[in-house]
Structure formats: structure tokens, C-alpha cells
């Protein structure tokens, strides 16, 4: 919403202010014209009232003059009536006073009527003038409203076009934001292999670093007790007994040369020796032996180490690289293994070759190799049994599988990969030794490295068996597997310790 407000909030406020200003102008125009009409009406009423008052005044004057003429006429008749009695002569002034009083009362009444009539006429005029004024007022108001209404369609059309344009922009912005969010989520979800190494080896690095820091914090003198404590610390870090012994002897030699007397110097020498042990002859042979046509990979290992899961993840990896992949379920004596591999095939959308229950594993493999050749498959992955407790039968089974594969492809299998669980520590080294006696191994798959602090077993395997690690599992996600790179591994294992 913040972007939306930045892009469109200001524009909508301007549109709203424009509409409000038009309505206010119309109201002001009506308000300004209303007093003018009232003033004009008032002037008309005043002029009419003045004319009326003038007429009333003239009529009053005429009435007063008539009353005086009557009075004068009566007075002129009094001398002609001189023959009346004295009593009548005495009563005449009284009658005259009464007439004068009556005349004055009549004049006052006329004046009162004169004063009353304008107000009554005003009251009478107001009903007569009010309809005309209100009619004119409403006519002007209707005219102004009509003007406003005539302007509204154009403004409404403009507002609708602007609203449509803003809605289109809003939609485009929402789409762009969703695309950006999706791309950012994808970018966040897609880690580089170096980042995966750092993440997955965090526990191993933290455990080894904590032990090394605790050891150096208790540093006293470089004596025999010091070397014994150092060897114990390395063994607890799962680097193996042979690696611990070799490193301790090398450090004794360095101490004699007085190159390792201080804690920081000791720390550097220990890490340098660990790197030298893994580097060895500089030949790692970590690359997969891919062929130009069909590459056959044979997977061996005990049950529960993540062998079938690793096959499914690698199938997903290679399929997304554009390669044609096929799987073979040769662990026919364990129904769960066949079902698990079939489920992985469904998930990653690759074909899986299976046989009947308790079928000969070699026959299922032979069928799978022939199908792979006929379908121009790039990579064929074969899942085998892991019954290490019955070494003789397992050895015979693996030898037979190798023979039937060579009938179709003489130089196959091109890779025989042993899957090891890194969390088992030194037990993984024991399994590697046992399987190397049963069948020739070309490489190792190290799984569950992210959930353990025993990643140092790689150094032990490298030191004692000279078998390269070719794949490493970083976690539970479908893409959490990759080719092993020794430099990235050692950096992830030892980074931050110096």
C-alpha cells in the first residue's frame, strides 16, 4: 500500500480537491445572488410602501379639510339662529365641543388606520411578493444547478478515465509487485552452494570452534599434557583417531622449532595442518564420471542413511538440467524401498523400473539397463539393498549386478557411490571401510550434514580411505543436494576460527 499511496494517493487528492472547488464555487454563486435578489425585492417593497403612504396621507388631508369645512358651516349657521332660547345658546358650546372631540377622534382613527394599513399591506404584500421571489430564487438556483450538472458529465467522464487509468496502473503495479515478490522469493530460496555449505556446516564449525577456543583458553605450557589434551579434543571433534594423531605429531615438531608458543600461533598451525591433511596429494577426483551417452550410477549403503532420498534429489537435479533420467528399484526384498523410489519417481516425473516382489535384483537391473539404452536415457540410477549384516550375500548380489550391467555396457557402472549419514560420526567411517571391501567405491555421498556437529568425519575418510566425497546433502529440501567441493567444505568448516 505504501507504493500505491505514493503513486496514486496524491493524484486522487487533486481530483477530489478539483471536484470540491467546483461545488464550492457553485454554492458561492448561489449565495451571492440570493442577497441581491432579496435587496432588489426589498427596494421594490419600499418604493411601493412610500407610494401607498403618500396616497394615504393625501386622503387623510382631504378628510381633515372636509371635517373643517363641515365645522365652519355649522359655525356660520349659529348667528342665523339668534332667536333660539338662552338654554340652547348655552348648550351649543357643549355640542360644539362634542363635535370637535368627535372630529378629533375621527382624525385620530383615520391616522390609526393610516398607520395600521401599511403594516397590513406589508403583510398582504409579503404573501403576494413571496411566491414571485421564491419562484425567481428557485429558477436561478435551478439554472445554476443545471450549469453544474452540465459540467459534471465532462468532469465525470474525465474522472472515470482517470480512475480507469489509475486502476490500470494499480493493476500493473500490483502485477509488477507480485512478480518482484515472486522473483525475490525465488532469489531468496535459491542459495548458492557456498551459502549452503556455510549453513549446513554451521553446527560442525560451531562445535569444533567451541572446543578449540575452550582448549586455547586453558592454555598453559606446551608440554606433553598439552599434546594429550589436544589429541583428545580433535578426536571428540570427529576428525578421527588417525587425523588427531598425525596432527599432534606435526604440532610437536612445530613446537620444537619454536613456531607454536602462543595461543594464536597454535590456532593457526592446527588449522593449517587440518587443511594439509585433506589436501594431501592435491588430487580429489570429485567430479562425476559422466559419459557422452548413458551414465550408469550404482548406489550402495545401509538402510536409513538417506540413500533412496539422495537418488530422488539427484533425479530432480539432473532433470532440471535438461537430462533424461531413469530409476531402477533393485532392492526387491524390502517392499518399502520399492514404494519409496516409485514415489520419488512420481514427484520428480521420471520413470522407475520395478520388478515383481522378491524378484532377482540382477534381473530387474538388466531390464532397466536395456530400457534406458532403448529410450536414449542420459543417466540411469540403480538403488540396491543395504544389508551390511550379511556381507557375503550382499557382496555376491553386488557382483552379479555389476556383471549384468557390463553385458549391455562394458565399462559400466561408471559410478559406485556409497551413501553415509554424517550424523553417525565415526560409525560412517566404519561403514565406508566395510563397503570398500565388498565392492570398489568411486565416491561417497555425505547426507544430513546440516543436522550434526560431526562433519569432521570427512577428514577421517579422506585420511584413511582416500575415497573422495562427490555429493553432499545440505538439508531436507528437494534441491538440498550438490556436488562436493573440498575448498568450499573446508572454508565452511574452518571459517571464522582464525
Swiss-Prot record:
The gene is ftsY. GO terms for biological process: SRP-dependent cotranslational protein targeting to membrane. Residues 36-46 have a biased composition (Low complexity). This is Signal recognition particle receptor FtsY. Involved in targeting and insertion of nascent membrane proteins into the cytoplasmic membrane. Acts as a receptor for the complex formed by the signal recognition particle (SRP) and the ribosome-nascent chain (RNC). It catalyses: GTP + H2O = GDP + phosphate + H(+). Residues 1-130, 147-200 are annotated as: Disordered. Disruption phenotype: Doubling time increases for growth under nonstress conditions, unable to initiate growth at pH 5.0 and under 3.5% NaCl salt stress. Double deletions of FtsY and Ffh, or FtsY and YidC2 are barely able to grow in the absence of stress. The lineage of its organism: Bacteria, Bacillati, Bacillota, Bacilli, Lactobacillales. GTP binds at residues 301-308, 383-387, 447-450. PROSITE patterns: SRP54 (PS00300). InterPro entries: AAA+_ATPase (IPR003593), P-loop_NTPase (IPR027417), Signal_recog_particl_SRP54_hlx (IPR013822), SR_rcpt_FtsY (IPR004390), SRP/SRP_N (IPR036225), SRP54_GTPase_dom (IPR000897), SRP54_N_sf (IPR042101). The keyword GTP-binding applies. GO terms for cellular component: cytoplasm; plasma membrane.
Amino acid at each position: 500500500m505504501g507504493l500505491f499511496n505514493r503513486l496514486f494517493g496524491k493524484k486522487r487528492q487533486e481530483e477530489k480537491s478539483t471536484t470540491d472547488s467546483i461545488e464550492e464555487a457553485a454554492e458561492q454563486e448561489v449565495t451571492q445572488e440570493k442577497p441581491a435578489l432579496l435587496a432588489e425585492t426589498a427596494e421594490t417593497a419600499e418604493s411601493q410602501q412610500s407610494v401607498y403612504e403618500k396616497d394615504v396621507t393625501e386622503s387623510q388631508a382631504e378628510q381633515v379639510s372636509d371635517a373643517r369645512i363641515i365645522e365652519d358651516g355649522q359655525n356660520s349657521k349659529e348667528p342665523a339662529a339668534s332667536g333660539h332660547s338662552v338654554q340652547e345658546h348655552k348648550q351649543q358650546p357643549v355640542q360644539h365641543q362634542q363635535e370637535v372631540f368627535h372630529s378629533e377622534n375621527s382624525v385620530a382613527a383615520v391616522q390609526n388606520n393610516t398607520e395600521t394599513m401599511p403594516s397590513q399591506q406589508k403583510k398582504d404584500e409579503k404573501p403576494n411578493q413571496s411566491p414571485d421571489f421564491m419562484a425567481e430564487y428557485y429558477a436561478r438556483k435551478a439554472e445554476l444547478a443545471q450549469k453544474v450538472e452540465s459540467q459534471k458529465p465532462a468532469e465525470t467522464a474525465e474522472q472515470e478515465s482517470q480512475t480507469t487509468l489509475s486502476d490500470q496502473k494499480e493493476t500493473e503495479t500490483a502485477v509488477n509487485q507480485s512478480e518482484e515478490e515472486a522473483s525475490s522469493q525465488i532469489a531468496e530460496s535459491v542459495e548458492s552452494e557456498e551459502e549452503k555449505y556455510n549453513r549446513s556446516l554451521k553446527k560442525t564449525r560451531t562445535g569444533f570452534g567451541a572446543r578449540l577456543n575452550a582448549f586455547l583458553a586453558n592454555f598453559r605450557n606446551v608440554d606433553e599434557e598439552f599434546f594429550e589434551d589436544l589429541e583428545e579434543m580433535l578426536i571428540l571433534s570427529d576428525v578421527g583417531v588417525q587425523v588427531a594423531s598425525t596432527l599432534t605429531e606435526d604440532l610437536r615438531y612445530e613446537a620444537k622449532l619454536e613456531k607454536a608458543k602462543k595461543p594464536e600461533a597454535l590456532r593457526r598451525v592446527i588449522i593449517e595442518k587440518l587443511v594439509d591433511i585433506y589436501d594431501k596429494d592435491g588430487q580429489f577426483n570429485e567430479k562425476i564420471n559422466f559419459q557422452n551417452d548413458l551414465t550408469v550410477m550404482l548406489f550402495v549403503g545401509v538402510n536409513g542413511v538417506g540413500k533412496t532420498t539422495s537418488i530422488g534429489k539427484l533425479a530432480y537435479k539432473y532433470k532440471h538440467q535438461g537430462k533424461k533420467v531413469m530409476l531402477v528399484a533393485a532392492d526387491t526384498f524390502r517392499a518399502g524401498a520399492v514404494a519409496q523410489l516409485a514415489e520419488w519417481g512420481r514427484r520428480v516425473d521420471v520413470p522407475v523400473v520395478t520388478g515383481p516382489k522378491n524378484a532377482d535384483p540382477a534381473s530387474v537391473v538388466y531390464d532397466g539397463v536395456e530400457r534406458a539404452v532403448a529410450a536414449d536415457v542420459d543417466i540411469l540410477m540403480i538403488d540396491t539393498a543395504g544389508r551390511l549384516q550379511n556381507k557375503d550375500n550382499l557382496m555376491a548380489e553386488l557382483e552379479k549386478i555389476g556383471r549384468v550391467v557390463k553385458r549391455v555396457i562394458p565399462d559400466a557402472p561408471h559410478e559406485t557411490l556409497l551413501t553415509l549419514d554424517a550424523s553417525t560420526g565415526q560409525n560412517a567411517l566404519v561403514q565406508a571401510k566395510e563397503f570398500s571391501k565388498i565392492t570398489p567405491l568411486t565416491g561417497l555421498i555425505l547426507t544430513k550434514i546440516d543436522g550434526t556437529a560431526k562433519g569432521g568425519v570427512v577428514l577421517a575418510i579422506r585420511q584413511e580411505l582416500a575415497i573422495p566425497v562427490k555429493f553432499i546433502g545440505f538439508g531436507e529440501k528437494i534441491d538440498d543436494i550438490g556436488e562436493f567441493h573440498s575448498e568450499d567444505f573446508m572454508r565452511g568448516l574452518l571459517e571464522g576460527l582464525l
